[in-house]
Amino acid sequence: VMEASNNEYNQLFQVAGKPDTIFAHLHHMKYGAQALINKLIFQEFDESSYSGTNRNVDQSILLNEFKRISMTSSIDAIGPSNEHYDAWFHRFCNWKLLLMEKNMPWLISWRYYLLETFLEAMKHVWKSHLLAQSSHGVISLYEVKERTRFHGVIMEVVDPDHDDTFFLPEVQLLVNPGFHLQYSTIKAQVYLLPKIVNFDSHIVIKHRD
């Protein structure tokens, strides 16, 4: 697993306009990076221009595209010479990669190492977009605003080792958006505001009213 340096993370949050972001532990900074990446990836998810170019097509066509790409590998889907080439998916991947490189320049040196993982992740996101666009509003994405009080019905904490003792019940970062389905909800994943910051055993108490 490749990880960014502390300086790269700090630069990332400065560029994103979030220099005051607080993490309870140093390794929690990865959740901040995930939050910023996902914000770019899911931007305009519910719009017809999600691929970077506006398109207005019948919902049945989108459903057929969903079925087709579900049966195609992400690598084959972006290869113009391949039988199952998907021009819209290819355009979507290029558009999101350009956004990420513009906002997170340190990712450029990783692009070839992460390309296959990136494409596979984008395939799942694109499939979700196609399904949502063809569902007549049955499937929709929802986001949780920062400083919102934690609500367990529609949110879950992203860190599997989360300890309520060290956090306020207040959302600091939306890491992964949630989805409303017809009869259920996929919860949004959030990172809460820490009370205590522990970097290399140096404890700093953080209180916010």
Give the location of each predicted region.
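Compact beta-sheet-dominated globular domain cores
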Residues: 115-116, 121-128, 141-209
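Internal, charge-rich low-complexity segments
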Residues: 1-120, 124, 128-143, 149
